[in-house]
């Protein structure tokens, strides 16, 4: 398992090609290694956005994450192959099972059960493994079925800070141990990623919890501040916390959303 840190930034939305490319340049200037774009209706299509970004950055280029249920495996593999070639092999493909019923309805697609969506994600993943074996795959989630799939087939495990409703004393450690058991001998080859959802943007050291609260609306501020995807304190304090995550959990790949890019850049500087 890698010991070197990597940092990803999730970005989306720009009024024009020039505005998008300027956002990408700024992100690279903050020290990020990977540009990650989402896959949601209403946001720019991920592959054209990544191809445009490739013109102005040396960062690796990824999705966080493609809704696998939107794609037929052979057509997706064709697009991934073309994108990887046109970006000189910089693609990292993040995959998920999809969760927003309204997006399936807008796309005029049936909304399968969670189990059926994960089963289809497995079908897509195995096809890509066979036909595009050199493109790294991330699978993100928290439940047992999707984490088992990730442990067996992914290169990168996208952790969400623990399992919703978990009663474990340390939900993040519990999920990592689950992946370790499911992965067996290949666990040492896996890279662990977590998305940091809250970062202080001023000298107070107190983060804006609005993004975190969107995913955990029933928790109090005190409970939100205790979550592993929330950082507090100075850039040096946060850097020390990420070192602890590496040493205690084996997590070396950290991602933030674009609104936190500049603030998190100061943390990256502490770790480089």
Predicted regions: what they are:
Residues 1-272:
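Active-site-adjacent structural elements that line small-molecule/cofactor binding pockets in enzymes
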């Amino acid at each position: 398992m890698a010991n070197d840190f990597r940092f990803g930034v999730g970005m989306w939305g720009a009024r024009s090609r020039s505005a998008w490319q300027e956002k990408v340049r700024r992100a690279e200037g903050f020290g990020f290694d990977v540009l990650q774009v989402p896959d949601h209706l209403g946001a720019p299509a991920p592959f054209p956005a990544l191809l445009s970004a490739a013109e102005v950055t040396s960062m690796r280029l990824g999705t966080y994450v493609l809704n696998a249920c939107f794609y037929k495996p052979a057509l997706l593999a064709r697009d991934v192959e073309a994108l990887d070639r046109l970006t000189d092999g910089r693609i990292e493909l993040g995959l998920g099972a999809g969760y927003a019923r309204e997006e399936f309805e807008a796309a005029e697609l049936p909304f399968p059960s969670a189990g059926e969506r994960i089963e289809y994600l497995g079908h897509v993943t195995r096809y890509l493994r066979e036909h595009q074996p050199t493109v790294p795959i991330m699978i993100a989630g928290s439940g047992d079925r999707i984490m088992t799939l990730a442990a067996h087939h992914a290169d990168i495990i996208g952790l969400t800070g623990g399992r919703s409703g978990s009663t474990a004393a340390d939900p993040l450690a519990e999920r990592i141990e689950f992946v370790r058991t499911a992965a067996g001998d290949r666990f040492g080859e896996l890279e662990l990623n977590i998305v940091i959802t809250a970062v202080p943007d001023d000298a107070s050291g107190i983060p804006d919890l609005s993004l975190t609260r969107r995913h955990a609306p029933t928790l109090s501020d005190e409970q939100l501040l205790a979550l592993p995807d929330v950082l507090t304190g100075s850039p040096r304090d946060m850097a020390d916390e990420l070192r602890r995550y590496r040493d205690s959990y084996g997590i070396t790949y950290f991602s933030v959303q674009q609104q936190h890019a500049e603030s998190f850049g100061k943390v990256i500087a502490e770790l480089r």
